[in-house]
């Protein structure tokens, strides 16, 4: 399948980047287009291009402003010059991947001793912990974007019955902690202050700088969680 660009806006991000903004929403079809455009810019780099960074519904293009100043016509800013190049590229039809992406199954121990918020969240949602676990594991989630920490995958969308607001005050969070924030779910790859509601922990290492591919997950992947007990967690 090929597509032309959906409606978007362009705005500068400092003096060395432009963001292509498709709107503030979580939409799988739109995210597929964002990733397709990401590949387009990576494979068809314009002079001065540095990198492209995809998000849920936007794509940020970084460029070398010093190099661009050598190319831009007199009376035109670097932003105006790059905006023209980006608009030209976005006018081109591009292929959008339709076949299912890679499926990664990740074990999670939901035992309350490893999940600081599961009991409170279950009570808040008027569910048993078993019901909450079932609702979290029965879906296949899409990795919409990477960010926050190396290897941190923003996944969605969770069942509305277990969606939860972020904590008002961030708390120390262990590496491997599985959390929910809004309709997103994610795994902390490193120990960090965090505001997500922690409902479990995985023994899987999400980030390892010594691996060929340091991050286990990539944008566009699909993820399914499955429940394990404390013994399986300890001996994984």
Task: Identify the role of each PLM range.
Residues 2-236:
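Glycine-rich active-site loops that engage anionic ligands at enzyme catalytic sites
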